[in-house]
Structures are given as C-alpha cells and as structure tokens.
Amino acid sequence: MNECNVHKEGYNELNQYLTTTQSKIFQCDKYVKVFHKLLNSNRHNTKHTGKKPFKCKKCGKSFCMLLHLCQHKRIHIRENSYRCEECGKAFIWFSTLTRHRRVHTGEKSYKYECGKSFNQDSNLTTHKRIHTGQKPYKCEECGTSFYQFSYLTRHKLIHTREKPYKCEQYGKTFNQSSTLTGHKIIHNGEKPYKCEECGKAFSIFSTPTKHKIIHTEEKSHRCEEYCKAYKESSHLTTHKRIHTGEKPYKCEECGKAFSIFSTLTKHKIIHTEEKSHRCEECGKAYKESSHLTTHKRIHTGEKPYKCEECGKTFSVFSILTKHKIIHTEEKPYKCEECGKAFKRSSTLTKHRIIHTEEKPYKCEECGKAFNQSSTLSIHKIIHTGEKPYKCEECGKAFKRSSTLTIHKMIHTGEKPYKCEECGKAFNRSSHLTTHKRIHTGHKPYKCKECGKSFSVFSTLTKHKIIHTDKKPYKCEECGKAFNRSSILSIHKKIHTGEKPYKCEECGKAFKRSSHLAGHKQIHSVQKPYKCEECGKAFSIFSTLTKHKIIHTEEKPYKCEKCGKTFYRFSNLNTHKIIHTGEKPCKCEECGKAFNHSSNLIKHKLIHTGDKPYKCEACGKAFRRSSHLSRHKIIHIGIHTEETVQK
C-alpha cells in the first residue's frame, strides 16, 4: 500500500487504483476505509450496526468483537495484575500501569503550542480538537457532536435515560460506574487517598493531586503585567487574556466570545432548551432528573444529609461538605501578603485580588470594574432592576438568593454563628470573622497612602476616598455631591423625609437601619463595649472606637481653610459649611435654611409641636434630648433636699 501515497486527489481515484491492483478489496459503506480480508470488513461493520454478539458470562457486559471480550475477561481473572510500587494500585495492563506512574512522577512529555502539556498522547490529541474545533463523534439522535467518544457515550444516556448503576444503600442510580464508586465512598466515609506530606486523607483520587500544590510552592510562570505567578504555563496563558482581552472561544449560536473554554461549554446550555424533567408542584423544568429530585426537596422539606458533628441536616450533599469545614476550623490556604487563611483555594484566589487591586471584569453599561465575575453579574441587575428572589413571609424581593436566605433569618431569628469570646451571635459566618477582630485587634487591611490599618476591607475602600477628594454621586434635588452612592441614598431621605426603620418598642422611626440598631440599645440598656482607658461603657462598638480618640488626642482630619482639626471626617465636613456659607437643608414649611440636616429636624418640631423626649419623673415633654437632660437636674436637686430633710 506504500505506492498509494501518490493518489492524493480523493477517494474515487484511490478506489479505482485499488480495484485494478488488488482482487480482494473490501470497502466500508459508512466511511472511506478499505480491508484486504472479508473478515476484517465484517468486524469493522459490526461497530456501525451497534450489534454486540459477544457477552461476558460473569457480569453480562456485551462487546462487538471477540478480542474485546477476551481483554475484558482479565478484569475478573486478575491473575496477571500489575501493581504500582508507589501507591499499591493494581492494573490489568502493563501499559495502564506505565501511564499511571506518571501521576507520581508528574511527567508531561506531550506538549502543545499553547503551552499546555499532557502525560498521554491521547489526551494531547483530544486537546488539539479544542483549537481545531474538530468534533468527530456525532449523536445520531439529535446531531450533537463531541470531541471525545466517551462524551458521546455519556450523552446517549440522555436519550435513553438509562442509569444502570444503582446504590444499594440509598437506591440512587447513576449513568456511570465511576460516579457510583465515588458516591459509595460518601456513605462509608472511606478516604483511601493520602497526602504523603501532611497525612491528610481524601475520598477522591484527583483531590490529593490538587491538594499537593499547597506544599510545592514553585510558581515558575510569571505574568509580566501584574507579576502574578502560576504553577502551570497554561494557567498563565489563560490569565494573560484578562490583560489582552482575547476571547478565542466563540459560541456558534449567538456569537458571544469567551476567554476560557469551560465557560463557553457552560454557556451553550442556554441555547439547548431541552428540559424534559418538570416539577409537578411549581412547573419548574430541569435537564437532568437528579436536579429535579434535589429541587423537589424544597417542597417536601426533605433533608437526607446529616452532619454527624452537630446534627444539622441538608437537602444537598455538597452543602453538607461545605458545612463540615465549620467544625474542623482547618484553613490550609494562606495568603502570603497579609497572612489570612482560608478553607478553600478558590476563596484564596479571589482574596489575592484585594492586594493587587486588579479589576478585570468591566460593566459595559456604566464602565464600573470589579475583581470578580460574580460581583459583576450581581451589579448588572442594578441596570435591569430585576429582583427574582421573593420572601414568602413579608413579600420583600431581592436580587440574590443568598441575600434572601440571610433575610429569612430576620423572621426566624436564627443566628448560628456564635463568638466564643463574648457570646455574641451572628447570622453570617463572615460577620463573626469580622467581629472576632474586635477581640484580637487584628487589622489586616492597610492604606498605602497614609499607613492607616483597618479590620474590614470595605472600611479601607471608604477611607481611600479621603485621599482622592472625588465625589461622583450628586443629588439632583440640591446639587450636593458625595463620594459614596450609599451616602447619597441616605441624603435623599432628607428631601423625601422617609424613615423606613421603625422601633417596635417606642415607635420612633429612623432613616438608617444602623441608627435603629443603636437606638434599640436604649431600651435594653446593654453596654457590652468597655473602654480600657477610663472604664466608660457603650452599647455600640463604633461609638467606643470614636470615644477612644479622646484619649489619644489624635485629630487626623484637618480643615485646609482655617487649620482646625477634628476627630471624625464627618465633623470636618460639617465644619466646612461654615466657610462656604452653604445651607442645603431647607424647611418646606417656612423656607428657613440650615447647614445641617440634624438642625432642620430639630427646627421642624416647632411646626409639628412634637415633643418626643418625656420626663419619667413628672411627665413633662421636650423637643430636644438636651433640654430633657437639663430638666432632669431639677429632680435630682429635689431628691437630694428630701434626703437631707429625712
């Protein structure tokens, strides 16, 4: 057949040549493939018909070729198994053992031009198809094509809905034997894969491989742009696309481009609207029956996955896995910059962006940039105004499901995260982490401009604006500008007079939820925050922080006009109005203007006649709390005189 390489024009010329030179040529009707023997041709055709005449008596598995059955039988015999000296794992074929050994050596001799390397030539061949777009394996049922034959085999089960592998313990079925094997480990708690470095054990073989990277701190592939380093060149190649804006993976359906291939794969699901598994309760549809099974638990309230440590139950196994970390308190992933430790490597990766200040994800609508794609997705909802997550208890709607979950705790009163130091409880683990810094005094977030440190990152972000003097958020009503959108929102309430936060105890209303929280302490008389310097106690921690400045005599906020210094930035802002003569807060009743909203609020009481501050001793009411305080001295004097007379 060597002389046939001259016939490159096509199949017809090759066929003509073979017919004249060979008397026994057998051809495949489906593809351009030729055979010298009828037996070989018949064997090959069996693949296309789907017939599997050769059956294993031991397990019932069928094959299209006798050779494949003979190879399969060795699984049951296991006489000539080849064992790995490194981990003890046994293999039927020596070639499989050779491939497996590369897991331990880390050898990846098959390299492609994009920088990615592989330990098997078959993996390289499959990877090449990503770049070429070649998908040789096509589903006859729906026409979907795949890079790998194994993907096609798995895909076919969607049409047949066949799940032949069943868990004997729970009855759950799977379409792959490997998935069943992995699932079984969940029940028996077996962790056969151990890290030689630290002794940590894992239930899945691939997990210790990922875990080992923690110990090997070698990151030889460095980004020239931001000096970020990676262990693999392929990861660096992907990272560089953030700076270049390159998006080589394009969706054929809508034209949308992506920088990562896996993101394109996830995106494609949007276009394939096949959702055959529908919930009878609410009508929601899913592509997979397992997703429907999980969804149904919302209606039934079933929570089959129980935590052995605290007894808490969950509807999804993955949530139980995440929950278990609370009890271990293990945080193996540490930030080299600030020393903060994390339970997951993905969380550490997200955290690192704080130090680099890199914001690669930009909103096309308003130009605002973010350090996480998830934050950008959440931000986009601002422009659409969509709030799909609604509270069944009070009807309030939210942009995020996580915000709804946290909101629900208001109705239940649940605060599962408790501080061991002072007993204070929180509804979020992140709030507990932040709270703990009060006791430790840890301030990991430092301002590069002035060196001031903060315990919360958001406080650092707010602080940075002091150095820039930028005020992008302007009030349309009075023209006043602010450096934060949240302050503008609060300011707007001056014009509207809106006070949505009401005290259930006395009926007093507030513009801010934080003001209501502070006010509530009046009724409880609880003052858990004590000053170590003078012993004075406070109901709010922020008030203690402000108070501490008195002892240090530090006044970091200086007026450029007259040189006067202040403890607080807000006091400086209030003071500045003296020089400008600005009076933005106007009374709608009489037209009188004030330089501060608090003065306007006090003034309004003249028109309403409202006297909210009442003396408990004699019942006399006052417009201002300061007037009530002065009045109380009268009773103290009377009480003293009565005591002396007695």
UniProtKB/Swiss-Prot annotation:
InterPro entries: Znf_C2H2_sf, Znf_C2H2_type
Record's keyword annotation contains Transcription: yes
Disulfide bond sites: none
UniProt-annotated location(s): Nucleus
One GO-annotated biological process of the protein: regulation of transcription by RNA polymerase II
GO molecular function list: DNA binding; zinc ion binding
UniProt KW keywords: DNA-binding, Metal-binding, Nucleus, Repeat, Transcription, Transcription regulation, Zinc, Zinc-finger
GO CC annotations on file: nucleus
Function text: May be involved in transcriptional regulation.
Protein name: Zinc finger protein 493
Gene this protein is translated from: ZNF493
